[in-house]
Regions:
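Polybasic, low-complexity RNA-engagement segments
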Residues: 1-48, 304-514
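Mobile active-site "lid"/loop adjacent to the S-adenosyl-L-methionine
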Residues: 137, 174-214, 227, 231-239, ...
Length: 514
């Protein structure tokens, strides 16, 4: 099964350990789900899940699904943003950053969004998450997945790492680089990756990873931390990459990769994979196929200096207040347009398959850009007034939050400075005025459904749950007339409008079950 180049290299590096470390515990690749703390606890999820689970060793919020034919994208809890479908070892990297509420966090290579959803859960709606993806189509998938997960404080970018570093130098408290890689950890999961694999691809991805790491270093604030990860085994992209980075950046130190968590997993790094450069491989981590995952490498790097003081819970720093004021001023000049529609997320398999392709495209400089559409048919003042009236009725806790007009639609903005970066979303697009009435957006319900005063409460066993997710009208049992949030077991699925005992379906067409 292994590619000829891959097997020859690994046998030379590992010797007699090769067959043991690459022995898979089962013929089919393991499936995993990671639970979002924005919705519930791992214990709360396990108590309600209707499919067999066992705890993952790689992340306290993750589980291995013990049902080979499980289709996560069709499960109502997936639609409600309760879990993200992730290969088990892929959930290991994000917790290593030690993210806390109030931090500014950058996920530099974020699509399709699994690790960003973990970082958002750690922030608990406070601070800032900037999730970037260079390939335009994947950036749209990223945006859609963060909407589904109910993330309210994210900025989604479609940019190059170098431009982000130039626009936001020394800005972030934490940076995650889950680098585009040669994807050797996908061989069992995606046999097609074998056909794409070669030594030239490894070298190209290593060069790209070095450039991305240099940009990440420039964007990291003094005292900040950076976690670098890949899903490959190639020395040039793993231990060798980190060792070379430390040679270029003496201001960084290699820290124990497990220093921010209270559990252990995997194995130490390999001393013969550093390219002859010094590296304390006991501080980095590898996950081998024999350990229950497809394969991952992780290292934690700490920048010199003193970390900034984080704001008090629920408060903005003075500069963040200025950014919000600037966004409001820019919104006064907004123009009308059509409402933005939700993107259809690709399934996790397609997103994983694109990892190596994204690396090749980035190396070759290929990427298309798509611009965010504006929304609404009212003036900025009319849009804001309509939103305030709507919020007072249905989301009173949101009525006094800072709101701005973007292209005629109303946005609850993330605190983010004005730049020339290509922003796909900066906060929560709550809706727009259409035909003289405020019409809420799907993201409003996924991000703030728990605050809605009018809810249609469904359960996993309720036949109306699948009917709603399929786009059909359902009977109203608990919601009064008007707009409502449709929930499953208390978790928000989306919006609807009640009239005459029926809930008119407003679940986005692109997301519906077929």
């Amino acid at each position: 099964m292994p590619a000829e180049y891959f097997e020859a290299r690994e046998r030379a590096l590992l010797g007699e350990r090769y067959d043991t470390l690459y022995a898979a515990p089962q013929e089919t690749a393991a499936r995993g789900v990671t639970v979002s703390a924005l919705r519930t606890t791992p214990e709360g999820f396990a108590a309600r899940a209707d499919f067999p689970l066992r705890p993952s060793p790689f992340c306290k919020a993750a589980f291995v699904v013990e049902q080979p034919d499980f289709k996560p994208g069709r499960h109502p809890y997936h639609h409600a943003g309760v879990f993200y479908s992730q290969e088990p070892s892929a959930s290991s990297a994000a917790p290593l950053l030690g993210v806390r509420p109030g931090m500014r966090v950058l996920d530099l290579c974020a699509a399709p969004g699994g690790k960003s959803s973990q970082l958002a859960a750690a922030l608990q709606g406070q601070g800032l998450l900037v999730s970037n993806e260079y390939v335009a189509a994947r950036a749209e998938i990223l945006k859609s997945n963060l909407e589904r997960m109910g993330v309210s404080n994210a900025v989604v970018l479609n940019e190059t790492p170098a431009r982000i570093a130039a626009a936001l130098p020394e800005f972030f408290d934490r940076v995650l680089v889950d680098a585009p890689c040669s994807g050797e950890g996908m061989f069992r999961k995606e046999p097609a990756a074998l056909a794409q694999h070669c030594e030239a691809l490894v070298k190209q991805c290593a060069e790209l990873g070095a450039d991305i790491l240099d940009s990440a270093a420039a964007a990291l604030a003094p005292g900040g931390e950076l976690v670098y990860s890949t899903c490959t085994f190639a020395p040039e992209e793993d231990e060798g990459q980190v060792a070379a980075f430390l040679q270029r950046h003496p201001e960084f130190t290699l820290a124990d990769v497990l220093g921010n968590v209270d559990y252990a997993f995997g194995s130490e790094g390999e001393a013969n994979r550093t390219g002859g450069l010094p590296l304390d491989v006991s501080k980095v981590r590898r996950i081998w196929p024999c350990q229950g995952g497809e394969g991952h490498f992780m290292a934690r790097l700490v920048n010199a200096g003193t970390p900034r003081t984080l704001p008090a819970p629920g408060e903005y720093t003075p500069e963040e207040q200025l950014w919000l004021a600037a966004a409001a001023e820019a919104g006064k000049k907004a123009k009308g347009g059509k409402p933005q529609k939700a993107a259809k997320p690709a399934d996790a398999r397609s997103a994983r398959r694109e990892n190596s392709r994204a690396c090749r495209e980035a190396v070759q400089g290929r990427s298309s850009r798509s611009r965010d559409a504006g929304a609404g048919d009212a003036s900025p003042a009319q849009s804001l007034a309509a939103w305030r009236e709507f919020a007072e009725e249905y989301f009173p806790e949101l009525a006094k939050r800072p709101a701005v007009v973007h292209g005629g639609g109303v946005l609850l903005p993330a605190a983010f400075p004005q730049t020339n970066l290509h922003v796909l979303r900066a906060g929560v697009f709550v809706g727009s005025v259409q035909k003289g009435r405020f019409v809420p957006e799907h993201h409003l319900f996924t991000a703030f459904g728990a605050l809605c005063r009018n809810c249609e409460e469904l359960t996993l066993a309720d036949s109306r749950t699948v009917e709603y997710l399929s786009g059909r009208e359902i009977e109203a049992h608990t919601a009064a007339d008007g707009w409502c949030c449709v929930t499953v077991d208390g978790w928000p699925l989306g919006g609807g409008k009640v009239s005459g005992g029926r809930v008119k379906n407003h679940y986005p067409k692109a997301l519906r079950l077929l």
